[in-house]
Design a protein with these regions (language model features):
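Nucleotide/phosphate-binding catalytic cleft detector across ATP-hydrolyzing
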Residues: 1-81, 136-166, 187-190
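Glycine-rich phosphate-binding loops at beta-strand->alpha-helix junctions
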Residues: 38, 137-140, 192-216
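Phosphate/pyrophosphate-binding loops at sites that engage ATP/ADP/AMP, CoA/4′-phosphopantetheine
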Residues: 177, 181-196
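Glycine-rich phosphate-binding loop plus the immediately following alpha-helix
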Residues: 36-62, 98-140, 243
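Gly/Thr-rich phosphate-binding beta-strand-loop-beta motif of the actin/hexokinase/Hsp70
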Residues: 72-103, 118
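Glycine-rich phosphate-binding/hydrolytic loop that grips phosphoryl groups
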Residues: 225-253
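Short beta-alpha connecting loops at secondary-structure transitions
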Residues: 102-103, 116, 161-164, 195, ...
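Residue-level signature of catalytic and energy-coupling elements of molecular machines
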Residues: 50, 85, 118, 180, ...
Length: 253
């Protein structure tokens, strides 16, 4: 494993805890740090790709930290919050308190996990992704007095019950949310998130996913960060307002 970055947590100068020990006098000093690590093979493979393309690497930045800089306010970091980035293949959980990164982990579950599950209804992934975006609902409830809703495949070859589709969506979404909240609990800060939970990422747009997280966590203060805090000027056909480009925007700021 390689250490990619180090986030200082606190220092102890003598018997006193300090956020910044510079300029203080003491007989001894201790420090607590959060090490952000990744498999060595992943980093080397990434560097090799750029070398093969003859592109120089100016710097290596960690995506969750870049995203946090783009979407979190200073007040949220100070008060305590959890940033949950629902991506296609992974879900990242970052916990902040007192302007310090306290916890960071990546789960190997994301929006594509739901899409692949939907393919069990005998369709290709492209079609499954379309249906997920159009009809997917983490808390689907069908009205008793209404006719059962259905959706058609693109080629009109057959129809699928929306309830069958969302049984699959809800099951996988529940697994992802359960794992997210478990990681927040492991951080030890689940009762210190005064600013609540901030959701971002393309997969966070699944209907009622925020309600599922609210029900699991019992935290009412949950917001969706679909755009970065800074102003971005771009053509409407380029700028996506769904949170999927927030890491990219963070690299620009």
């Amino acid at each position: 494993m390689d250490i990619l970055d180090v986030a200082p947590q606190e220092y102890k100068v003598g018997n006193n805890l300090q956020a910044n020990p510079v300029g203080l006098v003491g007989s001894h000093i201790e420090g607590r740090f959060l090490n952000i690590v990744a498999r060595t093979s992943v980093r080397k493979n990434l560097e090799h790709c750029f070398q093969q393309a003859k592109i120089d690497i100016a710097d290596q930045l960690i995506a969750p930290l870049v995203t946090a800089n783009a979407v979190l306010t200073e007040s949220e970091r100070r008060s305590g919050c959890a940033l949950v980035d629902f991506g296609a293949d992974t879900t990242t959980i970052s916990v902040y308190k007192n302007n310090i990164l306290r916890f960071l982990t990546v789960l190997p579950l994301g929006g594509n996990s739901i899409t692949r599950d939907i393919t069990s209804l005998q369709m290709e992934e492209e079609e499954a992704e379309r249906l997920k975006k159009a009809y997917g609902d983490a808390f689907y409830e069908e009205e008793e007095d209404q006719e059962e809703a259905t959706c058609k495949l693109d080629d009109d070859s057959r129809t699928i019950k929306v309830s069958d589709l969302n049984n699959i969506v809800e099951a996988r979404a529940e697994e992802i949310i359960a794992n997210v909240w478990n990681q927040v609990q492991l951080s030890g800060y689940e009762d210190k998130l005064l600013a609540g939970i901030i959701m971002t990422g393309g997969a966070a747009n699944l209907k009622n996913l925020d309600e599922m997280l609210r029900k699991r966590s019992k935290i009412e203060k949950i917001r969706m960060a679909k755009l970065p805090r800074n102003t971005v000027h771009a053509p409407s056909n380029v700028l996506k307002k769904d949170g999927s480009q927030n890491t990219l925007f963070g690299l620009l700021f």
